[in-house]
């Protein structure tokens, strides 16, 4: 229903009577002032007008400020968006707000992973302890194969335990606080394992003889078969014979044999024994001038296929040195080089004992006499050095300088015999001549096992073979460098000693330098059937550098391809 205006006015009067009274009072006052002070009416209206304008201007000024602030804010936000990536700006806050449940789940997963890894570590440690206390695994009838497998298992377990601990450290690092102490008894256990550790030579178990020769009794060494490595092995056996027969050993002349004093220190042998047990040929000749310079008795260890393994040409060389040979070549027993019999100390003393001043025995390289004694670390003779026959001081120092320059401490040495080895190996069963790709696989396995950084290559192989071998020796996707001794370079000083003493171009010095470097390696890979390799193994055994990872190339394998016979 509509209401008229009078009703509205009545309601208004009832609702706000105070306002109405003030209005009426103000109107009465204005009216009275206008009546009594007519001249001042204009002035009063001017003041009201001024106040009204001031208020109006204030409102305008305030509005301008709001506009300026608003525009500035818009510009600032625009610049912020232009100069930064909005996603990066709000990523941290939004992600922390939205992904907090996921973050909690990640933490729970990490802690769960830590628990599982700890359980794995305990299980591996249990396996590890079981391998250590079960020596029967190393004493099985399949000695070689089972021992290698056993060592590989132990190495793998050790690596897994180390990896396990590393993973735990990574997962645990975000959860650590300043007062965290999460160590356990397991962490304090030393489970490190060196797969290619040094071999315990058990020197206390050596069986030796004393070498105390009579100063007027001599044994002339005859070593003719093979090259320098054969002769050095022969010379070591001659020392054993001289010790058993109480004689001074005469080192052969370079006109009849190799020049031994260039590669080994002869006088050092006397120092190791503490007495004169060996004498150079020239010294022997000076002593013999007082008497008749001759060989009183020439005894042959082998009777076939040729007495003493000596031909007429070598007899002429001996006589050319001014030595006369009384009597004929004789053999105390029937002995074939191809099938040598096992002989004892008593056999030698009985068959080779003589009252003659000078006797010669040859050739004893193939002699199979007390091999257990001969193959001991340091040999069968009691002395105070590590070994009696070792490289000269010049060669030792040069080898050390080469290793410091090119190889470092942890390196593998490889004797890779190729020249003339194909026919030699194929005459054996099984053959020992391996195709390059197969050889590379065998080498890579040893590198992986030993963690060697570089390989020193001692070889007579052609460049075509060594280049292919280099490209194929790959471990973990990386080619393992093969290092050979470089040609002479005046800027390099590692070989300065050899040049200073004028022996840099001697092939036997080079060969002995190669042997020395190989003998000092962390791990050695040799060539089966090579006496060069055997002499390196002798040095490693005597020096205590032999490793449990030392082995012949591709040991236990046959070549995957063998050529037919001629």
From Swiss-Prot:
Its EC number is 2.4.1.-. GO terms for molecular function: peptide-O-fucosyltransferase activity. The chain crosses the membrane at residues 66-86. The keyword Transferase applies. Residues 1-37 are annotated as: Disordered. Pathway: Glycan metabolism. Glycans are attached at residues 93, 129, 138, 179, 190. Residues 1-14 have a biased composition (Basic and acidic residues). It is an enzyme of class 2 (transferase). Gene3D superfamilies: 3.40.50.11350. It is a single-pass type II membrane protein. Keywords: Carbohydrate metabolism, Fucose metabolism, Glycoprotein, Glycosyltransferase, Membrane, Signal-anchor, Transferase, Transmembrane, Transmembrane helix. GO terms for biological process: fucose metabolic process. Substrate binds at residues 415-417, 531-532. It is found in: Membrane. The keyword Transmembrane helix applies. InterPro entries: OFUT2-like. GO terms for cellular component: membrane. Belongs to the glycosyltransferase GT106 family. This is O-fucosyltransferase 36.
